[in-house]
From Swiss-Prot:
Keywords: Carbohydrate metabolism, Isomerase, NADP. Substrate binds at residues 171, 182, 189, 203-206, 216, 295. Its EC number is 5.1.3.20. This is ADP-L-glycero-D-manno-heptose-6-epimerase. Catalyzes the interconversion between ADP-D-glycero-beta-D-manno-heptose and ADP-L-glycero-beta-D-manno-heptose via an epimerization at carbon 6 of the heptose. Transmembrane segments: none annotated. Its cofactor is NADP(+). The lineage of its organism: Bacteria, Pseudomonadati, Pseudomonadota, Betaproteobacteria, Neisseriales. It comes from Neisseria meningitidis serogroup B (strain ATCC BAA-335 / MC58).
């Protein structure tokens, strides 16, 4: 049985491939666009059966000529995730139409289809629950994800031939994101700031939040891969699900976890947030004027629906997840 993973050389895709490998599954077709060649490193530690360029894959899907038999599932992680890319033509073709073509093909062939949606569909909302009235995307990236989620909702009412699951990822961090540049997680950037400068910067107070007190639902990519595989194991489940921890934690906590993990590797003792600030290992910079009124100061996934679907595993909190991530970066990137 063959499994297809799109975006397989990317951040989440490569972690799904790795998680499948840990189950002994290697009959995997990895689909990606390696024009950014350094992404190959994410697959170098994985076992796959074949690599297929994204454009050739799309052509074969659209012409219904993919040569693989007994495809067990498609994990669709291939998309433009740059929220600052405002090229609507590219975004809608790459994120919406590509995903729609894959959905149609999977439904025709009765193949389970698990795809990456995004918490960006909620825009600046304060309630993050999988309900249409709460969804107000602020950019074309969020809209591309939102629009496809609406397609799934309509298809579910009409009746599906095979499982379809969309995961609304919140703030994902973890190994294999180094190719993402400015779009990499805050944990990644804090690690490199601390290693280069000996301190990390956080935004100061804004919008009623104190220094570094803005919060996010930070979720480890290890947990993201686990949830994907849980639904792979349960093909009777379809729908749209938030994929976060259900906790909202401060950037202060993330910065402290990163700095303390780096300090531990240096044989230095853990310090409290107060001590880290006093020693200027965490510093605050004025909140940028350009972001005022546009910045989301709070996110927290409502994971009620995920729990109701039977997923019972506990998620890493920031301290434990970042500690694991920093150890990986010290071994692989430092």
């Amino acid at each position: 049985m063959t499994i297809i993973v799109t975006g397989a050389a990317g951040f989440i895709g490569s972690n799904i491939v790795k998680a499948l490998n840990q189950r002994g599954i290697t009959d995997i077709v990895a689909v990606d666009n390696l024009s950014k060649g350094e992404k190959f490193k994410n697959l170098a530690e994985c076992e796959i059966a074949h690599y297929l360029d994204k454009h050739e894959f799309i052509r074969q899907v659209r012409e219904h000529i993919l040569p693989y038999q007994n495809i067990e599932a498609v994990f669709h992680q291939g998309a433009c995730s740059d929220t600052m890319n405002h090229d609507g033509l590219y975004m809608m073709d790459n994120n919406y139409q590509y995903t729609l073509d894959l959905l149609d093909w999977c439904q025709d062939e009765r193949i389970p289809f698990l795809y990456a949606s995004s918490a960006a569909v909620y825009g600046k909302g304060e309630i993050f629950r999988e309900e249409r009235e709460l969804e107000k995307p602020l950019n074309v990236y969020g809209y591309s994800k939102f629009l496809f989620d609406q397609v799934l909702r309509r298809r579910m009412k009409e009746g599906l031939t095979a499982q379809v699951v969309g995961f609304r990822y919140f703030n994902v961090y973890g190994q294999h994101e180094q190719h993402k540049g400015r779009m990499a997680s805050v944990a990644f950037h804090h690690f490199h700031q601390y290693r280069e400068h000996g301190y990390v910067n956080l935004f100061g107070s804004n919008d009623g939040y104190g220094n570094g007190e803005q919060t996010r639902d930070f979720v480890s990519v290890e947990d993201v891969a686990k949830v994907n595989l849980y639904f792979f194991d349960h093909p009777e489940l379809s729908g749209i699900y938030n994929l976060g921890t259900g906790r909202s934690q401060q950037f202060n906590e993330l910065a402290a976890a990163t700095v303390n993990a780096c300090r531990a590797a240096e044989g230095k003792p853990e310090m409290s947030l107060k001590e880290l600030v006093e020693e200027e290992l965490i510093r605050y910079i004025p909140f940028p004027d350009a972001l005022k009124g546009k910045y989301q100061s709070f996110t927290q996934a409502d994971i009620t629906k995920l729990r109701e679907a039977g997923y019972k595993e506990e998620f890493f909190d920031v301290k434990s997840g970042v500690d694991r991530y920093v150890k990986w970066m010290l071994e692989n990137l430092a």
